[in-house]
Regions:
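Short catalytic/ligand-binding loop motif for oxyanion handling, primarily in non-cytosolic enzymes
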Residues: 89-90, 162, 193-196
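Aromatic-rich carbohydrate-binding modules that target alpha-glucans
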Residues: 22, 29-75, 84-107
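Non-catalytic, glycine-rich low-complexity segments
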Residues: 1-36, 118, 143
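An acidic-aromatic substrate-binding cleft motif
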Residues: 121, 128-184, 188
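Core domains of carbohydrate- and sulfate-ester-processing enzymes
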Residues: 83-141
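Aromatic- and acidic-residue-enriched carbohydrate-binding clefts of CAZyme catalytic domains
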Residues: 152, 193-207
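Short, solvent-exposed loop/turn segments at secondary-structure junctions
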Residues: 35, 158-161, 192-193
Length: 207
């Protein structure tokens, strides 16, 4: 039996997706109008719906949201939205997902330490987020971008350009591109796509 829905607007300015409030608290928000009930399930609750993870609904009945605390700083978590006790969905604004049908084709050199899929606990695509994600500090602060009229662009697909299929090998190949007179590279779509063989022009999810 579903509990009563709490109708309440999320904090002003909250965006859809996951918003990290601090290193142990996250706010989840899903745009899903005309739905009866939405639960948040994931690594943090054994992938089981409960009243604690029954999401609040905005006053206009379009956004479902919930604040989850007690998360471990620096930890990676998988999650889904369970809609009306029937179907489980990954977050459409995910920046990283787990695919039970294709992740086994991705080697550890391409994606080290991939978050494990919760086999036996759920089905379908799973969204992944990390509390206190690492930040990147630019090392080359003196880089000057070439003028547009001077660009010599090489478009490439990492998977096909280097046999190791990873960015570090591409970085190690920059000198070769420089010898060719290339001063810019354009990566073919480096985002999530359906299946496991694609040039990236059939995007799936946000990233």
């Amino acid at each position: 039996v579903n509990p009563p829905i709490t109708y309440q607007n999320p904090p002003v300015g909250t965006k859809n997706g996951v918003t990290l409030l601090n290193d142990s608290t996250a706010l989840f928000q899903l745009y899903a109008p005309e739905k009866d009930h939405v639960y948040l399930v994931g690594d943090f609750n054994g992938w089981l719906p409960s009243g604690t993870y029954h999401m609040n609904c905005s006053l206009d009945s379009t956004r479902w949201w919930l604040v989850v605390g007690g998360l471990s700083p620096g930890q990676t978590y998988g999650y889904q939205y369970l809609i009306t006790n029937q179907a489980r969905y990954a977050d459409p604004l995910s920046t990283l997902i787990l695919d039970p049908n294709n992740d086994n084709f991705v080697g550890n050199t391409t994606f080290p330490n991939m978050h494990p899929y919760p086999t036996g606990l759920t089905t379908g695509f799973v969204s992944v987020f990390q509390t206190t994600p690492p930040t990147y500090t630019w090392l080359n602060t003196g880089f000057n971008r070439p003028a547009k009229k001077d660009l010599v662009i090489y478009e490439l697909l990492v998977r096909d350009f280097v046999s190791a299929r990873n960015y570090q090998t591409l970085i190690d190949t920059i000198a070769y591109l420089d010898r060719l007179g290339i001063n810019a590279i354009e990566l073919m779509p480096n985002l999530e796509f359906e299946g496991n063989q694609s040039w990236g022009y059939n995007p799936s999810f946000h990233m």
